[in-house]
Each structure stands twice: as C-alpha cells, then as structure tokens.
C-alpha cells in the first residue's frame, strides 16, 4: 500500500501507462486474446501475477504489479480490477487478490485491498468495496456485495 499526491510524477506516469494500455495494448493486442493463454502472457509481461489455468476476459488491470489472479480463477468480461482510488487529491494504492478457483463475474469491480477467497464467486455487475474479504467457498453479489441468499 502506498499514497501519492495528485500532482506527483508517479501519478502522471501511471496515467501514461494506463493510456498506453487503453489506446495501444487493448485494441491491438488484448481484445482478440480474451480467454486464451495469450492475454495471460501479455498481462504477466505487464506485471500481473497469474496462476495456471486462469481465464481472463478483461484488460482493466491498472497497477498490474499489485494484482494476483490465482490458479483456475476467472475474471469476466468488462471487469475492472482497480488498485487505486483518489481521496482528497491523494492516490492510494493497494493490492487486489483473486484466489485459486474463484470468479469475479462480468462487469464487476474490485476495489483496492479486496480479496476474493478460494473457490468463491462474486456475481455479475457487483462492486467489491475497498478492503472487502469474500470468504472461501462463498457466493456474494450486489452493489456493494453481500452474501447471496438463495
């Protein structure tokens, strides 16, 4: 975890890297590779720690070195794994962990310091708030997430 003032060089270099991914890497290299080993290789090259057999259908991984996707985990299409937030003109960074066999479903957002436990599922369109911990073998969904009641 780290904090950086809005006007620091770190923040602006970080925005430059995000722009590179959104303007060059995503349209030219990533979008045709969703769900394949190729996107995993590309994201690993940018710094994401990705386990064997992970299924990834999104390129929205800012601060790639702060993200861990476990073995056989799934990141759905349109999902954002967000590792920073701004508050009072300060950029706060923290890790996001998606453990082995877990699923972050389509169009969901995971905020910094969140953890999705082993073999757990976060339903589509859900928001995993900063610091949330989804327990092992659980199903949560909603905005913000809460345990799913069948």
Task: Please annotate each region the language model reported.
Residues 1-46, 135-150:
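Terminal amphipathic alpha-helical/low-complexity segments used for targeting or macromolecular assembly
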Residues 55, 60-68, 72-74, 80-81:
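Soluble catalytic regions of membrane-associated enzymes that act on cell-envelope
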Residues 74-150:
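Glycine-rich hexapeptide-repeat left-handed beta-helix
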């Amino acid at each position: 975890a780290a904090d950086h003032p809005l006007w620091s060089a770190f923040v602006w270099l970080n925005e430059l890297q995000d722009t590179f991914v959104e303007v060059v890497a995503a349209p030219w290299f990533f979008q045709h590779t969703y769900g394949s080993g190729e996107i995993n290789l590309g994201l690993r090259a940018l710094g994401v720690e990705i386990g064997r057999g992970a299924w990834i259908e999104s390129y929205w991984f800012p601060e790639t070195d702060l993200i861990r996707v476990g073995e056989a985990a799934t990141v759905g299409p349109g999902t954002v794994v967000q590792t920073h937030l701004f508050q009072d003109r300060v950029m706060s960074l923290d890790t996001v962990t998606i453990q082995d066999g877990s699923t972050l479903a389509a169009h969901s957002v995971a905020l910094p310091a969140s953890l999705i436990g082993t073999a757990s599922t976060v339903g589509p369109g859900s928001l995993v708030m900063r610091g949330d911990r989804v327990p092992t073998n659980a199903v949560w969904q909603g905005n913000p997430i809460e345990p799913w009641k069948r």
